[in-house]
Amino acid sequence: MSVGLPGPHSLPSSEEASNSGNASSMPAVFHPENYSCLQGSATEMLCTEAASPRPSSEDLPLQGSPDSSTSPKQKLSSPEADKGPEEEENKVLARKQKMRTVFSQAQLCALKDRFQKQKYLSLQQMQELSSILNLSYKQVKTWFQNQRMKCKRWQKNQWLKTSNGLIQKGSAPVEYPSIHCSYPQGYLVNASGSLSMWGSQTWTNPTWSSQTWTNPTWNNQTWTNPTWSSQAWTAQSWNGQPWNAAPLHNFGEDFLQPYIQLQQNSSASDLEVNLEATRESHAHFSTPQALELFLNYSVTPPGEI
């Protein structure tokens, strides 16, 4: 048997095989023969890298989501989009062609009659009416709702017409009593709101000017005293107080004028009797007791005596 010499690619010997168990702990030792193989493989790798240069990062394509602004949008095809706008038009026409309930003349008369009596019906009343007219509850309810809307619209139009007519005619504004001043004409109001003094204007109230303030209890009484009729009221001092007889004198003349005319028609004997009575009354009233009685009588109203 011929034993081959160990070459560069020969198998390891038995000693090397026995020591192979400790290869993990000991570093591998390469012989000079192995360096030639390693150098050859390294030169081949360098040549391949030089022949085909590695592309840079700029040359590599970006692996990510495409930009929405640059990349074209992909249209998703769906069966609904393929059908086109024709089917949408058909849907619109189907909505417009909604079934309308056709009422008979008898049903319309019954519904209108009930609407005039009662505009709002309860659930039970609608069910009873629908059973009588052979209609559904929804049909009766819808008819009443539409009728109420028509009635409200008609009332609104009528109100607008009447208001426009009044504006065009230019009707006079309504005068309210609270707008006018409740004070009389002579009572002027200053800018500050205070009431001024009475002016030169007179009180012109038609309700007062036509009325005469007459007291029936006083009209029936005649205040004529024959003892005072011919008495002359002269200025004299009673108890040291001066008495201004000018207004009383004028008042006495006006008051005694009809009585004096009556005396002129009387006889001379009657005149002498009256003069005598006047002297006696003058002498009687010249006393202080009579004067005090006269003053108390003049102050006290006739009804309280």
From Swiss-Prot:
Coiled-coil stretches noted in the UniProt entry, renumbered to this chain: none
Cellular compartments annotated: Nucleus
Pfam families membership: Homeodomain (PF00046)
InterPro entries from the UniProt entry: Distal-less_Homeobox_TF, HD, Homeobox_CS, Homeodomain-like_sf
Annotated stretches, region: Sufficient for strong transactivation activity: 248-305
Compositional bias annotation for Polar residues: 65-77
Span list, region Disordered: 1-30, 46-95
Major localization class: nucleus
Entry annotated with the keyword Transcription regulation: yes
Chain segments carrying region 10 X repeats starting with a Trp in each unit: 198-247
GO molecular function terms noted in the UniProt entry: DNA-binding transcription factor activity; DNA-binding transcription repressor activity, RNA polymerase II-specific; RNA polymerase II cis-regulatory region sequence-specific DNA binding
Annotated stretches, region: Sufficient for transactivation activity: 198-247
Keywords: Activator, Developmental protein, DNA-binding, Homeobox, Nucleus, Repeat, Repressor, Transcription, Transcription regulation
Recorded GO CC terms: nucleus
Region of interest (Required for DNA-binding), residue spans: 123-152
Annotated Low complexity bias: 13-25
Sequence repeat ranges per the UniProt record: 198-202, 203-207, 208-212, 213-217, 218-222, 223-227, 228-232, 233-237, 238-242, 243-247
UniProt KW Nucleus keyword: yes
Cited function: Transcription regulator involved in inner cell mass and embryonic stem (ES) cells proliferation and self-renewal. Imposes pluripotency on ES cells and prevents their differentiation towards extraembryonic endoderm and trophectoderm lineages. Blocks bone morphogenetic protein-induced mesoderm differentiation of ES cells by physically interacting with SMAD1 and interfering with the recruitment of coactivators to the active SMAD transcriptional complexes. Acts as a transcriptional activator or repressor.
Quaternary structure note: Interacts with SMAD1. Interacts with SALL4. Interacts with ZNF281/ZFP281. Interacts with PCGF1. Interacts with ESRRB; reciprocally modulates their transcriptional activities. Interacts with NSD2.
Family of the protein in this entry: Belongs to the Nanog homeobox family.
Protein name (record): Homeobox protein NANOG
